[in-house]
Amino acid sequence: MRKIFTAIIEYDPETKQYVGMVPDVPGVHTVGSSLEEVRRNLKEVLELVLEEAGDEINHQEFVALEMIEVET
């Protein structure tokens, strides 16, 4: 069965690395030197965690990403 998970990827200018995580699944986070690498790493880690956890993962159907504007 195929499932789609939401991943969040940010660029860290201090380390010059992309940092990725899947909020729905504890333990799924990784880094990569490019977007392609971090995507590949996230998929690999996610597959390993899901294989280990079996049906214990509570997959969320919706995750919101909001832009919040503030005065600075």
UniProtKB/Swiss-Prot annotation:
Biological processes, Gene Ontology terms? regulation of DNA-templated transcription
Using the record for this protein, list the coiled-coil segments as residue ranges, or answer none. none
Q: What Gene3D superfamilies does this protein's entry cite?
A: 3.30.160.250
Q: Which domain of life is it from?
A: Bacteria
For this protein, the parts annotated as crossing the membrane are none
Entry similarity comment: Belongs to the UPF0150 family.
Query: What name does UniProt use for this protein?
Result: UPF0150 protein TM_1321
